[in-house]
């Protein structure tokens, strides 16, 4: 697109204190100026923008491509006095004639929020001169529509001439949002409405992507994360949901985008792993008596093993602390040692000797798998009939497997003795 030099003339009269545009006319005007600056910069980065006040006809900021300077000067504007329309437009034209890039087209964007004191003849003479100098003027009329509508319409018609294009008059009714109205107007969207489409996502969230790309990218990522979370809640089936690679909008830096996608995928995998690692409910009613007995014995042995696997701490007189698992025999010096209890362990763990004595030995296992011992344990359980055929089969199976293991162990010890 062609390059353009634009002077934005803002109304800073006392009428701008009115609250028919939320929160005030002045604040609504400032938001609209920010929108126009963003659209101009999005169309062409070589566009330059200046700022002028109508009440005291002061050039607040000369032509620049640094939008932050416009914002800084704009927030210093205070309402006072009345506007001088014709003199302000002439000064804006003079500032445009002194632009550095002569090939830039000249345009004035003027906000009118108070009555215009000049008569129609003076406005017509000014319009003819601007047309001769090839200066386009866009006027946003808000707040005082009935008073200024006729004058401004003739002014714009004189500027456009027979072509009828180039300059625009936008009248905004009180009570509406000035920023939203300009979004679809020719001032921002252009003659054919392609200005906003060409700007892409630059005006998303009301931010200029060229000014703060990191903040814009963070907002996009946050919105995408929220969208994924909502879709996950709608689908519902968290256990059957597979991890899908997230497609995020293009941002500043592909490496950061890839890391973010990886982090989101890992987070979803961790959630699925945590849900799958939880113990499943056991339906005891669906199990046979033999399976119930085997399950009860297995849980009892597992609980006993967990209680005896806590580490113990042995403190030697040489100020060396050795942490070792319970039940592991170690060859140490005959130097007198002192056994201390780890304060982090429960009081029931006791000393090292007490902990090692809790580990089941081969003799203890023989007793546990003894048929009479199992019958006595099962008789103490409510609802268990030891004379039941299934119960007898389960006891015989457990004792038989233990006896087979013991015989194999004895055969191995005999072979080792013969080899030695």
From Swiss-Prot:
The entry's keywords: Proteasome, Repeat
Carries keyword Membrane? no
Q: Which residues form the UIM domain?
A: 210-229, 255-274, 288-307
Instruction: Note whether Phosphoprotein occurs among the keywords.
Output: no
Ranges of residues in domain VWFA: 1-174
Family of this protein:
Belongs to the proteasome subunit S5A family.
Q: What is this protein called?
A: 26S proteasome non-ATPase regulatory subunit 4
